[in-house]
């Protein structure tokens, strides 16, 4: 959808956290979280495309879609509960759309197969929603919490390993000055360049330019 989606490419996010915190421990499976998030929103994503293709965009707009998939405040401890709440919210909206479009089953399934043909899968839906929403509402809040926990973990390690208070103070100060912020590091993230979606884009551009 946009560069923000690629910057949020799930397999690259651990390295972004390392760049922010200088701590390479893995404390939360961000790729799995985004996979489950994608699976949860996929049915509504298909409905969004269905409405657009059928000229009824006003009845379920992108803004309606984004409102339906909002997560609320993220925390590491409640990540599973957040996803479960999302699944229930999506299910309610899907039921509403089915009731509003009782004859749409076959055309909905056709759209579903077509978006899969185009490369969107239930596991990777996050890459194809509005980029700003993904960046600002889903990935950044998640990474802020992960990085805060990693920073606290590293600060605790430094404190325990220090021989005296002066060393502890100096090393903690040095560590603090070495930290980066999540938004800056995400915007510098080029880990998507080896991804299948990015290479598909390159291939499409090459084919397009070759036709001219």
Regions found by a protein language model. Name each.
Residues 1-212:
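Acidic, divalent-metal-binding catalytic cores of TOPRIM
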């Amino acid at each position: 959808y946009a560069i923000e989606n690629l910057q949020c490419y799930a397999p690259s996010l651990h390295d972004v956290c390392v760049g922010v915190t200088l701590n390479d421990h893995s404390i939360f499976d961000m790729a799995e979280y985004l996979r489950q998030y994608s699976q949860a929103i996929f049915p509504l994503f298909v409905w969004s495309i269905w409405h657009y293709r059928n000229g009824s965009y006003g009845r379920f707009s992108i803004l309606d879609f984004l409102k339906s998939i909002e997560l609320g405040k993220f925390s590491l401890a409640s990540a599973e509960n957040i996803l479960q709440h999302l699944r229930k919210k999506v299910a309610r909206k899907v039921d509403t759309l089915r009731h509003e479009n009782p004859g749409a089953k076959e055309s909905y399934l056709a759209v579903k197969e077509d978006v899969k043909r185009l490369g969107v899968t239930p596991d990777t839906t996050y890459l194809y929603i509005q980029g700003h929403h993904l960046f600002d509402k889903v990935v950044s809040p998640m990474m802020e919490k992960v990085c805060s926990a990693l920073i606290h973990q590293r600060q605790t390690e430094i404190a325990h390993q220090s021989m005296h208070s002066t060393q502890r103070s100096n090393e903690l100060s040095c560590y603090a000055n070495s930290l980066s912020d999540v938004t800056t590091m995400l915007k510098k993230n080029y880990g998507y360049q080896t991804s299948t979606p990015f290479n598909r884009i390159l291939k499409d551009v090459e084919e397009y330019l070759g036709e001219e």
